[in-house]
C-alpha cells in the first residue's frame, strides 16, 4: 500500500466514525509559545482538551506535519527515527472514549477492507493499573494475556511518569500497539492516550477524574507504511526512497544500507525533508528559536556531505525531489521550490565557509592538548564547536580517537543543557495548568498604568511561590504569607505601574508595600496578559486582597528609558549610514545599556561607526520632542511607522515618534526629549550569525565612565608592556604573535633563544602609532585591542597578565626542550634492553612534548629489526606526559599500548589510553615518575617473558 493511499484510508475510516477531518496545523504554531515546532497531532487541540475553547464538533481526525529533534542522534542510524514525520490521529473531546478508541484501532489495522494486517502479528501494552483497557483488549478484542503487557508509568502514561513526577495538569494512561517484524522484533505503530485525569499535588491520591474524558491517538504514517510495504526501514518507503536515491546521485555516492555513507544519505534525506517543509513555512535558518533548529539540521547534513568529500553546496539540489515526493498531500511545496532552494543554498555556502574554520579549531585544540598532556577532549570545547561551527560531537569523537584522545560526553551534555531551550525542537506538549494559568482565568489581565505614573495604589490578587523560570511552573498559589523569606516569590496586582519585560526592554524594579508588609521587586515579567512581579518579602506578612502602594524605582526606569530611546535613534542612524536593509533582528534594553541586532552582511568599519555615533549624538543634542500616540494600524502605516517583519501588533497600537526623523510601533517606556539621553557611546560591533551584526552601546553616566576608562587604558597597557602609550596597541599585537610563535616552536621541538622578559622595539618593528590626543584614534586602538585579545574592555589588562604569564612559562619550557633536544632515537635504542626477542625501551626524555616523543617512537620502530616496546616520559610544571608504542608483531601477540601506558599513568595520578600500537597519558604527580617508569619496565618484562 502506497503512503498516500494509507494517509487517505486512515482519514476516510475515521470520517465513517463521525470524526471531522481537519487540516494539518502549521509546523511553527505562532499561537503556542510553549513549543518551537508542532510535535504531535493533538497540539492544535490543546485549548479544546483543556475546555478553554468550544468546537462545533467533538470528534476529529488529522494528518499532522511534526518536527522533533529529541532523537536526532538516532536519525539515519535506526530504521524508524526521523526529525520530520507525519502523525495520523483521531481525537475525542468529551465524546467517545476507551472502548471505541481500542475497537476502531483494531478494526482499521486488521479488517481487510482497510489495512488487513494479520491480528497475530500485533501485540499491545497497557498501563499497569489500567484494568479497563486490559479488559477491553482481552475480553472484547480477544487478545490472549501473553500478548498484553502491563507497563509502568514511565512507559505507558502521558506525560511519562506524570503520576509520581508531574507536571500537574491533564494526563492519562496509554495503550500502545506493536507490529512484529520478520526478525521477531517489534515496532510501535500506534499509541492510544486516554486523558482521563487531572494531576494535582504529590502521590498518593493525586489523580482526579476529569468530568469530560478525552481521546488522543497517534499512528506514525512512515512506520506503518514501512510495515505494509515490507521494507526494512522508513527510508525505503515509496515517499522517502526517491529522496534517498536523489541524495545518492547528488552526492555521487552509491547507497548501501549498512555502510557509513548509507547512514549519511539517510540522515541527509531526513534533514532535507525537514528543512524544505520548514523553510516553505518561512522558518529560515538562523541563530535563535525554531530557526536555530533548521540551521542545525542543514549543517548536520552538510557535514555528512563534507565527510563524503563534498566541498560545495548540494543539499539545495534535493528541494525538487522532496517537493515531488510529497506533491500528493502537499502540492503547495512545488510553488516555493526556488525560494526554498535559495535559502538552503545560502545557508550551505555560509557553513562551508566555516567548516574549515571548525576543523582548524579542532586541530588547534589537539595541539594544545598535546602541549598540556591532556587525554580527554573537554565537553565544553565540543559544545562550543557544535554551537559555533555546527560540528557534531560524533565527528569530534572520531577525530579525537585518531589522536589517541577520549571524549568527555558527560561534560558535553552538561554544556549543551544551556542550549536546550533552543535546540530540543519543542518535542513535548504539556497541558500544564500552573498557578499563573489559574490566576489568569480569574483575573484575565493586569492593566499597565506605568506610562502615566510610576506609583499607584493597587490590590494584591495573587501570591505565588517560586520564580517560575523552570521548564515547568511548580509554584503554589497562596492566600497569604506570614513571614519574610529569602526565596523568590511572585505577586500579581489588579493593575500595575511596573513594566513587564517585553520588546527587548527588561522589567522594572522597585517596592510594593503598605503598613503590613514590604515586598522588594527585583524583576517584572509578563505572562500573557498579566504583569508578574518577582521579588522577596522583606518585612511583615502579606494577604491576598489587601491594598498596597506599587512604587517603581524611578532612577532605574529613567536609565531604561535613556537606553530605549537611544535604540530608536540608533536604528535611524543605521538606516542613514549602513542602508535601509539594516532592519532590527533583536534587541535588549537595560539600564543605560542597549544591544541591537540588525541585518548586514559584513562588519561596520571604525570610520562608519564614528559617523553613526556622531549622528546619534547630533540627534540627541537637538532636543527633539519624544511623544507617543495610540493610533490604528492603518494610520501608523500611513504615517510611515517602522514595523518589524513577522511581529504581531495590536490594533489600535502605540506609535513612538522622535521629532520628524523616527516613528516606530513600540510598547516600551521612553524619555520625553532626545536631549535626556545625555551621552552615547558604542562599545561593541560584532557578528551574531551569518548576515546579522550586533551593536552594544551605553548611555548617560555609563557612557561617560566608559569614555574615561577607554582614555586611560592605553597608558595602563603601556605600563604592563614597558612601552610608550602611542605604540601600546602594536606592542600587544607583538606579544600575541610571540606567544603563538613560542607555542609552535615548543610543539615542533625547535628551540630558540628568548629573553626572560618581553621586550618591544617599536623602531625595529616599524610600529604604527596612535595619536593619544585624539579620542577617536584612542578608541579605535582600544577596539582593535579587544578584538585581537577577544575580550571585553574590562578584561584587557587581566588578559595581558595571562599572556605575559604564558610567555614566561613557554620560555622556561623551551629551555627544557633545548636539553631534551640532545637526545636522539639512536641514543634511546642504545640504552634499551633485550627481553627475549624484544627491544624494551623505558626512558625519561626531559623537555620533550608528546609530539616529539611520538616521533622518536616512530623512528625507533623503523630502525629496529626486532619487536619493539617503547615508553617515554617527561614532566613540565609538575605535569607528567607519557607516550608508549608497540611494534605490529607485539600487537598481534595481544599486547596493547593503551593498557601499558594507562597502568603507568595511574602511578602518577593520571589516566590515558589510545590505540593498541600507540597511546599517551598524562599525570599530576611528577615526584612519582621514577616509580611509574620502573613499574612500566617490570610490567612489560613480565608480559614478554
Swiss-Prot record:
Its cofactor is Zn(2+). It comes from the Bacteria. It is an enzyme of class 6 (ligase). GO terms for molecular function: alanine-tRNA ligase activity; aminoacyl-tRNA deacylase activity; ATP binding; tRNA binding; zinc ion binding. Its EC number is 6.1.1.7. HAMAP family: Ala_tRNA_synth_B. GO terms for biological process: alanyl-tRNA aminoacylation. Catalyzes the attachment of alanine to tRNA(Ala) in a two-step reaction: alanine is first activated by ATP to form Ala-AMP and then transferred to the acceptor end of tRNA(Ala). Also edits incorrectly charged Ser-tRNA(Ala) and Gly-tRNA(Ala) via its editing domain. Binds 1 zinc ion per subunit. This is Alanine--tRNA ligase. Zn(2+) binds at residues 564, 568, 666, 670. The gene is alaS. Belongs to the class-II aminoacyl-tRNA synthetase family. SUPFAM superfamilies: Class II aaRS and biotin synthetases, Putative anticodon-binding domain of alanyl-tRNA synthetase (AlaRS), ThrRS/AlaRS common domain, Translation proteins. InterPro entries: aa-tRNA-synth_II/BPL/LPL, Ala-tRNA-lgiase_IIc, Ala-tRNA-ligase_IIc_anticod-bd, Ala-tRNA-synth_IIc_core, Ala-tRNA-synth_IIc_N, Ala-tRNA_ligase, Ala_tRNA_ligase_euk/bac, DHHA1_dom. Keywords: Aminoacyl-tRNA synthetase, ATP-binding, Cytoplasm, Ligase, Metal-binding, Nucleotide-binding, Protein biosynthesis, RNA-binding, tRNA-binding, Zinc. PANTHER family: ALANINE--TRNA LIGASE, CYTOPLASMIC, ALANYL-TRNA SYNTHETASE. Residues 911-945 are annotated as: Disordered. One of its GO terms (cellular component) is cytosol.
Amino acid at each position: 500500500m502506497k503512503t498516500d493511499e494509507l494517509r487517505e484510508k486512515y482519514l476516510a475510516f475515521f470520517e465513517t466514525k463521525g470524526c471531522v477531518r481537519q487540516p494539518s496545523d502549521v509546523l511553527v504554531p505562532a499561537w503556542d509559545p510553549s513549543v518551537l515546532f508542532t510535535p504531535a497531532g493533538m497540539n492544535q487541540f490543546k485549548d479544546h482538551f483543556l475546555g478553554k475553547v468550544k468546537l462545533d464538533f467533538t470528534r476529529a481526525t488529522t494528518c499532522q506535519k511534526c518536527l522533533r529533534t529529541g532523537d536526532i542522534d538516532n536519525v539515519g542510524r535506526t530504521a524508524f527515527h526521523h526529525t520530520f514525520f507525519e502523525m495520523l490521529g483521531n481525537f475525542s473531546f468529551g465524546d467517545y472514549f476507551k472502548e471505541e478508541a481500542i475497537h476502531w484501532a483494531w478494526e482499521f489495522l486488521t479488517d481487510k477492507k482497510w489495512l488487513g494486517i494479520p491480528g497475530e502479528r500485533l501485540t499491545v501494552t497497557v498501563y499497569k493499573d489500567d484494568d479497563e483497557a486490559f479488559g477491553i483488549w482481552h475480553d472484547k478484542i480477544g487478545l490472549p494475556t501473553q500478548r498484553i503487557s502491563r507497563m509502568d508509568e514511565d512507559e505507558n502514561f502521558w506525560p511519562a511518569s506524570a503520576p509520581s513526577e508531574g507536571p500537574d495538569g491533564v494526563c492519562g494512561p496509554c495503550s500502545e500497539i506493536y507490529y512484529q517484524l520478520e526478525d521477531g522484533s517489534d515496532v510501535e505503530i500506534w499509541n492510544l492516550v486516554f486523558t482521563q485525569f487531572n494531576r494535582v499535588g504529590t502521590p498518593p491520591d493525586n489523580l482526579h477524574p476529569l468530568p469530560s474524558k478525552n481521546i488522543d491517538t497517534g499512528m506514525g504514517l512512515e512506520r506503518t507504511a514501512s510495515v505494509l510495504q515490507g521494507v526494512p526501514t522508513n527510508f525505503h518507503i515509496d515517499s522517502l526512497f526517491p529522496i534517498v536515491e536523489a541524495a545518492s546521485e547528488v552526492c555521487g555516492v552509491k547507497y548501501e544500507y549498512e555502510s557509513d555513507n548509507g547512514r549519511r544519505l539517510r540522515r541527509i534525506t531526513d534533514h532535507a525533508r525537514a528543512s524544505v517543509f520548514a523553510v516553505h513555512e518561512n522558518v529560515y535558518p538562523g541563530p535563535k528559536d525554531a530557526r536555530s533548529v533548521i540551521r542545525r539540521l542543514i549543517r548536520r547534513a552538510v557535514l555528512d556531505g563534507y565527510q563524503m568529500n563534498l566541498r560545495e553546496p548540494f543539499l539545495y539540489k534535493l528541494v525538487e525531489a522532496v517537493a515531488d515526493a510529497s506533491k500528493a498531500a502537499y502540492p503547495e511545496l512545488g510553488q516555493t521550490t526556488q525560494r526554498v532552494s535559495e535559502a538552503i543554498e545560502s545557508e550551505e555556502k555560509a557553513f562551508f565557509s566555516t567548516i574549515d574554520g571548525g576543523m582548524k579549531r579542532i586541530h588547534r585544540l589537539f595541539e594544545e592538548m598535546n602541549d598540556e598532556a591532556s587525554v580527554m577532549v573537554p565537553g565544553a570545547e565540543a559544545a562550543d564547536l557544535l554551537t559555533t561551527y555546527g560540528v557534531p560531537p560524533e565527528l569530534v569523537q572520531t577525530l579525537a580517537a585518531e589522536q589517541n584522545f577520549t571524549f568527555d560526553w558527560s561534560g558535553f551534555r552538561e554544556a549543551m543543557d544551556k542550549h536546550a531551550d533552543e535546540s530540543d525542537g519543542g518535542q513535548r506538549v504539556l497541558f500544564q495548568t500552573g498557578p499563573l494559568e489559574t490566576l489568569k482565568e480569574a483575573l484575565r489581565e493586569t492593566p499597565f498604568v506605568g506610562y502615566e505614573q510610576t506609583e499607584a495604589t493597587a490590590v494584591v490578587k495573587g501570591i505565588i511561590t517560586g520564580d517560575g523560570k523552570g521548564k515547568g511552573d511548580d509554584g503554589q498559589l497562596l492566600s497569604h504569607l506570614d513571614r519574610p523569606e529569602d526565596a523568590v516569590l511572585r505577586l500579581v496586582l489588579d493593575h500595575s505601574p511596573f513594566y513587564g519585560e517585553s520588546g527587548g526592554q527588561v522589567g522594572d524594579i522597585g517596592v510594593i508595600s503598605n503598613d503590613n508588609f514590604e515586598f522588594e521587586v527585583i524583576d517584572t515579567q509578563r505572562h500573557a496578559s498579566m504583569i508578574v512581579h518577582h521579588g522577596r518579602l522583606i518585612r511583615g506578612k502579606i494577604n491576598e486582597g489587601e491594598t498596597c502602594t506599587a512604587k517603581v524605582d524611578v532612577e532605574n526606569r529613567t536609565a531604561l528609558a535613556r537606553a530605549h530611546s537611544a535604540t530608536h535613534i540608533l536604528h535611524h542612524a543605521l538606516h542613514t549610514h549602513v542602508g535601509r536593509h539594516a532592519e532590527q533582528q533583536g534587541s535588549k534594553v537595560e539600564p543605560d545599556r542597549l544591544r541591537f541586532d540588525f541585518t548586514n552582511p559584513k562588519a561596520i568599519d571604525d570610520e562608519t561607526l564614528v559617523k553613526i555615533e556622531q549622528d546619534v549624538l547630533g540627534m540627541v543634542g537637538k532636543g527633539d520632542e519624544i511623544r507617543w500616540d495610540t493610533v490604528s494600524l492603518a494610520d501608523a502605516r500611513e504615517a510611515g511607522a517602522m514595523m518589524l517583519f513577522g511581529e504581531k501588533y495590536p490594533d489600535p497600537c502605540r506609535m513612538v515618534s522622535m521629532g520628524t526623523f523616527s516613528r516606530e510601533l513600540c510598547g516600551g517606556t521612553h524619555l520625553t526629549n532626545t536631549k535626556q539621553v545625555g551621552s552615547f557611546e558604542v562599545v561593541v560591533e560584532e557578528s551574531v550569525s551569518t548576515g546579522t551584526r550586533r551593536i552594544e552601546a551605553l548611555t548617560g553616566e555609563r557612557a561617560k565612565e566608559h569614555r574615561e576608562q577607554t582614555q586611560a587604558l592605553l597608558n595602563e597597557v603601556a605600563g604592563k608592556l614597558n612601552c610608550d602609550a602611542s605604540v601600546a596597541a602594536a606592542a600587544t599585537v607583538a606579544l600575541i604573535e610571540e606567544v603563538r610563535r613560542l607555542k609552535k616552536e615548543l610543539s615542533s621541538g625547535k628551540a630558540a633563544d628568548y629573553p626572560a622578559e618581553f621586550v618591544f622595539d617599536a623602531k625595529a618593528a616599524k610600529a604604527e602609532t596612535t595619536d593619544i590626543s585624539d579620542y577617536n584614534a584612542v578608541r579605535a586602538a582600544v577596539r582593535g585591542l579587544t578584538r585581537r585579545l577577544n575580550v571585553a574592555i574590562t578584561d584587557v589588562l587581566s588578559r595581558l597578565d595571562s599572556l605575559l604569564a604564558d610567555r614566561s612559562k613557554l620560555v622556561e619550557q623551551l629551555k627544557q626542550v633545548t636539553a631534551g633536544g640532545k637526545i636522539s632515537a639512536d641514543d634511546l635504542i642504545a640504552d634499551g634492553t633485550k627481553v627475549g626477542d624484544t627491544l624494551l625501551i623505558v626512558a625519561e626524555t626531559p623537555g620533550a612534548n608528546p609530539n616529539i616523543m611520538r616521533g622518536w617512537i616512530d623512528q625507533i620502530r623503523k630502525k629496529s629489526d626486532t619487536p619493539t616496546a617503547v615508553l617515554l616520559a617527561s614532566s613540565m610544571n609538575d605535569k607528567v606526559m607519557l607516550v608508549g608504542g608497540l611494534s605490529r608483531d607485539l600487537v598481534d601477540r595481544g599486547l596493547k599500548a593503551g593498557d601499558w601506558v594507562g597502568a603507568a599513568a595511574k602511578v602518577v595520578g593520571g589516566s590515558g589510553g589510545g590505540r593498541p600500537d600507540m597511546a599517551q597519558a598524562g599525570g599530576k604527580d611528577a615526584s612519582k615518575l621514577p616509580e611509574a617508569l620502573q613499574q612500566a619496565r617490570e610490567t612489560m618484562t613480565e608480559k614478554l617473558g
